[in-house]
C-alpha cells in the first residue's frame, strides 16, 4: 500500500503502516547524523533543551552536499542508520516517531519502534538527487560548526520512502527475503 503522511505524526497516524508499504512524506523533517546525535545525547545528559521538539518528529540521517545556485539543497541521500543505533531508542522514547535512513537496525531500535508506535523508513540509497527534489526549504537550526552534519529543518513534499520497521514489529529486511525464498 502507499500512504501519504504529513509531519508531525502520532502513533495513530503510523499504526496502519506495514513493512514494505511506501510513503510519500510531507512536512518538516530534521536532519541529524552521527555527530548531531552525539550532541543531542550530551544536551539531554545535561538537561538542556534540544534544537527541535522530538514529539512526533521525523529525523533524516543525511549530510547533504552544498546546493548549487538556484537549488534549495544539494544531493541528499541517506547515510547508514546503524551508526545511530546506540542513540535512537532514547530519542524514540522521548517522542521521535519517524527515522529515515538506510540499512538494518539493531534489536534495541526495533524494540523501541514497537514500544513507541514509531517507524523506520528507508530512503533510496544512491539517489541523493531524487531525494533532494522533495526538499522545498532548508534552514540550519543547530551546530553549524558540524558542516554537513549540522541539524537542518527541511520542509519536504512527497518524499518517497519505504517502511522498513513498522510499529507492529514488521521488518522488511527480514520479511522481504523470506517471502522471496518462499515464492521460489
Predicted regions located by residue number:
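Feature captures the catalytic cores and cofactor-binding loops of soluble hydro-lyases/lyases
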Residues: 31-159
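Short, structured beta-strand/loop micro-motifs enriched in basic residues and often containing a Trp
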Residues: 1-9
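Active-site/ligand-binding-proximal alpha/beta "capping" segment
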Residues: 88, 164-184
Amino acid at each position: 500500500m502507499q500512504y501519504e503522511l504529513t509531519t508531525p505524526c502520532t502513533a495513530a497516524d503510523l499504526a496502519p503502516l506495514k513493512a514494505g508499504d511506501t510513503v510519500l512524506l510531507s512536512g518538516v523533517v530534521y536532519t541529524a547524523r552521527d555527530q548531531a546525535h552525539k550532541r543531542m545525547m550530551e544536551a539531554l545528559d545535561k538537561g538542556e533543551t534540544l534544537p527541535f521538539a522530538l514529539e512526533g518528529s521525523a529525523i533524516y540521517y543525511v549530510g547533504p552536499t552544498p546546493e548549487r545556485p538556484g537549488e534549495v539543497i544539494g544531493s541528499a541521500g541517506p547515510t547508514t542508520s546503524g551508526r545511530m543505533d546506540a542513540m535512537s531508542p532514547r530519542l524514540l522514547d522521548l517522542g521521535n516517531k519517524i527515522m529515515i535512513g538506510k540499512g538494518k537496525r539493531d534489536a534495541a531500535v526495533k524494540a523501541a519502534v514497537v514500544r513507541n508506535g514509531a517507524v523506520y523508513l528507508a530512503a533510496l540509497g544512491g539517489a541523493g538527487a531524487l531525494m533532494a527534489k522533495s526538499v522545498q526549504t532548508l534552514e540550519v537550526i543547530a551546530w553549524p560548526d558540524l558542516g554537513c552534519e549540522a541539524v537542518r529543518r527541511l520542509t519536504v513534499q512527497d518524499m518517497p520512502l519505504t517502511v522498513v520497521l513498522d510499529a507492529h514489529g514488521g521488518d522488511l529486511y527480514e520479511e522481504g527475503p523470506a517471502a522471496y525464498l518462499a515464492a521460489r
